Amino acid sequence: MSFQEVWEKEPMKKPRIQKVTVNFGVGEAGDRLTIGAKVIEELTGQSPVRTLAKQTNPAFGIRKKLPIGLKVTLRGKNAEEFLGNAFSAFKTCGKVLYASSFDQVGNFSFGVPEHIDFPGQKYDPSIGIYGMDICVTFEKSGYRVKSRKVKRSHIPKKHLVTKDEAIEYIQAKFDTEVVRE
């Protein structure tokens, strides 16, 4: 029995996207960071959070607690819309998604090297080109028992999202091919 048939019979077993995290590693504070914030806000529709350097690196001119990156967490419909655009940008730059990108509980990450690959984006010399890492986290219905405050419990292994389920979901929902080595 395929995953699609199981999901139709038992909707609680169908995985869903919990969140999509978009990371911009600019590497320096200042103008590039503020321009990057405008770019990521235009792509996602949300204002980003600045990430701080964890340690000092004099070779790159980075001090501890200096803002050097940006991140945005998307949930619900916004996450699915952004992920659809991200997959089209990913295909545009000639990349493929490998099964080795998925972990054992179905989460995966991929990178888009240029923000201008997204639909509707044009190159502007004053902005430059920014790349980003996109991390997708999956869950199933009932995962709230793991994170709630009262009567917290663990998720049984049979209810965790598997790597194969996540691959099947991505292929069906976003019409994206996942290459198995």
From Swiss-Prot:
Molecular function terms from GO: rRNA binding; structural constituent of ribosome; tRNA binding
Gene Ontology CC terms: ribonucleoprotein complex; ribosome
Biological processes annotated in GO: translation
Classification via Pfam families: Ribosomal_L5, Ribosomal_L5_C
Keywords of this entry: Ribonucleoprotein, Ribosomal protein, RNA-binding, rRNA-binding, tRNA-binding
InterPro entries assigned: Ribosomal_uL5, Ribosomal_uL5_arc, Ribosomal_uL5_C, Ribosomal_uL5_CS, Ribosomal_uL5_dom_sf, Ribosomal_uL5_N
Presence of keyword RNA-binding: yes
Transmembrane region(s): none
Family, similarity comment: Belongs to the universal ribosomal protein uL5 family.
Quaternary assembly: Part of the 50S ribosomal subunit; contacts the 5S rRNA and probably tRNA. Forms a bridge to the 30S subunit in the 70S ribosome.
Function: This is one of the proteins that bind and probably mediate the attachment of the 5S RNA into the large ribosomal subunit, where it forms part of the central protuberance. In the 70S ribosome it contacts protein S13 of the 30S subunit (bridge B1b), connecting the 2 subunits; this bridge is implicated in subunit movement. May contact the P site tRNA; the 5S rRNA and some of its associated proteins might help stabilize positioning of ribosome-bound tRNAs.
HAMAP family: Ribosomal_uL5_A
Protein name: Large ribosomal subunit protein uL5
Gene coding for it: rpl5
